[in-house]
């Protein structure tokens, strides 16, 4: 069994260093630890809320690391809104999926991206998308490919921690995001 007291995570130009007071164990078998696999009881509302917060924080951390690890010279930040004020996440995700398919068909290549849905106070959905290493595409062309509402695209310049910028859009308190993919 191995132990360690420090951990470093490198995500692009960002380095996270963790130092632990007690040793962290690795290379162990889960079967030895889980000897009492029995029925599990329903979590209390307090525990559910704590678990949601942990899950949300873990997702934001993952988004931050993914973006920082994949950012490139031609990366763009894209915001997609709906003219119809869509509030149904399944419908919005379907429309985004169709946009992605049309966009990849237009470009002739698969795009590398990370997408985060965000809800307004009225429950309307819009998307924040980081497009990694994307060639120049005219705004008008992108607008016609989206065709569901307003778009805004910006080149990512002079930003050291783009992942932190993107992860702040992740909505923690929205009930629609419970048990849903957050990025």
Regions found by a protein language model. Name each.
Residues 17-19, 129-134:
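Short, charged low-complexity intrinsically disordered segments located at boundaries
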């Amino acid at each position: 069994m191995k132990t360690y007291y420090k951990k470093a995570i490198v995500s692009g130009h960002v380095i996270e260093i963790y130092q632990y007071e007690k040793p962290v164990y690795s290379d162990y078998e889960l079967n030895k630890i889980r000897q009492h696999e029995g029925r599990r009881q329903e979590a209390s509302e307090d525990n559910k809320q704590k678990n949601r917060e942990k899950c949300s924080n873990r997702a934001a951390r993952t988004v931050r690391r993914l973006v920082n690890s994949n950012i490139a010279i031609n990366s763009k930040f894209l915001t997609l809104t709906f003219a119809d004020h869509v509030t149904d996440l399944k419908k919005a995700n379907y429309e985004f999926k169709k946009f992605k398919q049309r966009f990849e068909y237009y470009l002739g290549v698969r795009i590398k991206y990370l997408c985060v849905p965000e809800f307004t106070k009225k429950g309307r959905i819009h998307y924040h998308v980081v497009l990694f290493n994307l060639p120049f595409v005219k705004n008008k062309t992108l607008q016609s490919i989206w065709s569901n509402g307003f778009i805004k695209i910006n080149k990512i310049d002079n930003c050291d921690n783009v992942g932190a910028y993107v992860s702040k859009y992740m909505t923690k308190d929205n009930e629609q995001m419970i048990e849903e993919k957050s990025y």
